[in-house]
């Protein structure tokens, strides 16, 4: 009987550890493109929350990582979050749209379904 319990608890521990989802340790990348009415927002701060499908808050401490959206060659401003696992993520961005002289912000839920690859995501922002 004792051996069966040891085997059961060992299996349970291995199953729990191997089911890790969301966060870092994988081979996925999210390329987040912050945009306000289709206009790219360079230098916007782009935040990511692992395991979230809704906005967790608007403070930097509510998120797991942050990057600055940069213009790379002729591409629109974007930020890369690399090394992600399959799972749910929430991307939130804050920046300044010089065409309307306003601070803009917004976010979007992202689901990664594959083991590896890059997912381009437009982050819609409003005043």
Where do the model's predicted regions map?
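Short, surface-exposed beta-strand/beta-hairpin micro-motifs centered on an aromatic residue
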Residues: 76-83
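A short tyrosine-centered beta-strand micro-motif
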Residues: 87-93
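Bacterial signal peptide processing site
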Residues: 20-22
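Beta-strand-rich extracellular modules
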Residues: 35, 94-96
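Short, ordered, surface-exposed loop/turn motifs in non-cytosolic proteins
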Residues: 37-64
